[in-house]
Amino acid sequence: MDEFHRNGKEDSSWQQCFLYPLFFQEDLYAIYHDHYLDGSSSSEPMEHVSSNDQFSFLTVKRLIGQIRQQNHSIFLFVNRDPNPLVDRNKSSYSESVLEGLTLVLEVPFSIRSKNSVEGINEWKSFRSIHSIFPFLEDKFPHSNYISDTRIPYSIHPEILVRTFRRWIRDAPSLHLLRSVLYEYRNSSENLQRSLIVAPRVNTRFFLFLWNHYVYECESILVPLLKRSSHSRSLSHGSFPERTHFNRKIKHILIFSRRNSLKRIWSLKDPNIHYVRYGERSIIAIKGTHLLVKKCRYHLLIFRQCYFHLWFEPYRVCSHQLSKNCSSSLGYFLRIRMKPLLVRTKMLDELFIADLITGEFDPIVPIIPIIGLLAREKFCDISGRPISKLSWTSLTDDDILDRFDRIWRNIFHYYSGSFGRDGLYRIKYILSLSCAKTLACKHKSTIRVVRKELGPELFKKSFSKEREFDSPPFSSKSGARSQRERIWHSDIPQINPLANSWQKIQDLKVENLFDQ
C-alpha cells in the first residue's frame, strides 16, 4: 500500500486492477484484527463492543474461498443472523469484511484527496471544531443572510457506486461494492425507500462512504462558489473607510449605469462563503433577499440533479442575520450592530463620521443547557442542584473527576462567547450537585463533607478554570475581560450537551414543517 501511495500520483495504473485482489488477502484482515483489538479502527468506544465476539481467521479464509468460487458477496451475510449488518455485537465476521473493504478503498481515496488539497491551498482540514468560528467571525459581519443546510444521511446505493466509478476503473471492485451495499439495503428494515441510512450505524465503512460522498459534492461545489466571486483581492470589508466609501459611491451618478455597477462590484468582497462541519453546511451570503432565494434555489437544483440528493424543506433554513438568530454548533449565532465613531483630520478641518459595523456575537444557550442538566438529574427543572444518585456507588475521586470533566468541557467549548456570566450559573449547579452527591454517598450533610475534605473539595474539582486567569490569557489587570475571546484548538467535536440541544432545535423545526 505504501508503494501505491508513492506511485499513485505519477502512475494511474493502480486504478485498473489492484483493488479487487486486495479484498482476498488474509493479511488485510489481520491488519483489521490488530486495529480491532486496539480499538483504533472503529469510531465506537470499546465498551460498546461485546467481549464475547471472537475473531476467527479460519472463518475469514472460508468466506474468502466462497467469494472466489461464487463470484459474489451474498455469502458474506447469509446464515449468520437475520440482520447481521445492523447489530454490531452479532456480526464480527461481516464487520471484519466491511472494515477490510474500507481499508482497501481508503488507499486511492487518500491519494486523491491529498492531491486535491495540494492543488487548493485554501482548502485545509483542521482537527478542532473551533477552527470554524474564526472563519465565521471574519465573514459573518459582512454578510446579511445565512443559509443553514442539514445534509441527509440517506443515499441510494447506486449513487455511491457511481461516485466511486468516476475514479476507480476496476470493475470487479465496483461489483463487489454494489453487492455489499444492496445486501445491506435488503437486510435493513426500511425496504420501501431503498436507501442506505447510516446515522445510527456508526461504523468505519459507512462513515467512509458518507464522507466520500460529501467530499465529491464539495470538490465541485466549492470551486464553483469561488469562481462566482469577481474579486480576488484581500478582504477589506472590515476597514471603516472602505465601508463608508462603498456607501457613498452608490450615490454618484456621473458614470453610466453599466460602468458604475462594474466599478462598485469590483470593490466588494466575495459575497458567498461556505463552511461545513459534520452534516451541517453553512453558506453566508451578502446581497438582497432575491439573490439569497436564487442562490438557495440553484444550490438545491445542483445537489438534486447532479448528485440525486433530495432535501426536505425543513433541512434548509435561511435567516437574516440582522433580525434573527441562527442556532448552529450549539450556539445562538447573531450579528450585533456596533456604532463606531471615526475622526479624520485633513489640513485644518476635522471630519467626523458615524459608522455602524457588524460584530459576530455567539450566544450561549444557558436556559436550554440547564434544562438538559435537569434531564440528566444534576438539578431540577428550576435549576436547583440535586444529588446524582446513580454515581453514589463510585469512589470520591471518580465523582470529582466526572464533575470536573463535565465543567471543563462546557467551559472550554463556550469560552469564545462574549457573555460568560451564565456559565458560572452552570458551575454553581455542578459544584453543589457534586457536594450533594458526596454527602448522599457518605450519608451526611454538605457542611460535613466540606469540613472533612476541606479546601481540597473544590480545589480539585473545577480547577481548570484557573488556566484562563493566568498568562498569557489574562489581561494586564489580572482578569479576563468579558469582551475577550479564546477559541481552543483542542476540541475535536461538539460538546455533548450542546449537541443534544442542537438536535432538539432541529426536531422543533422539523415538527413545524410537518404541521
From Swiss-Prot:
It holds the Pfam family MatK_N. Disulfide bonds: none annotated. Its main location: plastid. One of its GO terms (cellular component) is chloroplast. The keyword NAD does not apply. GO terms for molecular function: RNA binding. It is found in: Plastid, Chloroplast. GO terms for biological process: mRNA processing; RNA splicing; tRNA processing. The keyword Repeat does not apply. Keywords: Chloroplast, mRNA processing, Plastid, RNA-binding, tRNA processing. InterPro entries: Domain_X, Maturase_MatK, Maturase_MatK_N. Usually encoded in the trnK tRNA gene intron. Probably assists in splicing its own and other chloroplast group II introns. Belongs to the intron maturase 2 family. MatK subfamily. This is Maturase K. It comes from Pseudotsuga menziesii (Douglas-fir). The gene is matK.
